[in-house]
Amino acid sequence: QIVDVQGRECSDFQAFSMCALDKGVEREIDPTTTRSLMGSIYPSPGIFSKYWTLDQEALVQIVQDTCGRHDTFGLACTARYYDDLGYPGHINCSDNMNKDLARFNIKPRGGWPAINFFFNTMLDDTNALGMDDPWSRPGDYVMLKALTDLICISTACPCDIDPANGWNPTDIQVRTYNTTENFKKSIGWRKTAEAEMEETKETGFHKSFARYTRNFIEYNGFWLANDMTNIGVVNEYWACREDAAIMDLSPLRKYEVTGPDAKRLMQKCITRDVEKFPIDRNVTTIAIIIPAIPK
């Protein structure tokens, strides 16, 4: 678990396969392979959650992410970067990584490819790669699961000359947990910029769907089944046409209105004539709720 203690601090992460190192071969996370296999600019909790080596071996899997904004394009910051900007001799992540990895006989590099957690980069209309202050807030974290024996390294980026760390480098905390611990996959999200962070939830039907699939995707704060194992899209199509299909609509936030005054309450909330609603069928309508203003 890589924790941004005070918020807006980048951490350049890399992991090496110990099995490969024992054979004298360096095989670490390769960002390009990862993007190609996952089909996204960086993995996230769910079905497309793994980081891969150049040999297409999965090393780690992201289980939880409360920030949701990272980078896989840039190197860990280098001496050359600071030299070019007029800060020769500035401490940098690549040199720090070289020093710590030397004891494992890992060869030094002028710039390390890395997973730059909490690094806020974007592509503009001219295809230029830019950066801005990180989105991470105090206590935000990513949780990773090792898929094999690894040597891992994670930095607290010392950059203080651009927005990478909000112009103020702070601490990164790394926690490790026993293999007996079990963490549910989740993505942190906020309804508004000022709202408290909420984690992705399982619906009341999750266990029933989990008997038939492991492919769950995040939607509107919930994990929903994306497909059923060994069924396929063609069979799903014909099931919708000729047989039956089941969907979990929990994220739509539907409610049941019951009781002797249910009809009167509904008539106050909507413009449709409730008396014309069929008793034994579902009805879709929209209610606009306006909060009362205290006098």
Regions picked out by a protein language model, each given a short descriptive name:
Residues 1-189:
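Acidic, Ser/Thr/Pro
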Residues 180-295:
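Glycine/proline-enriched, intrinsically flexible loops and inter-domain linkers
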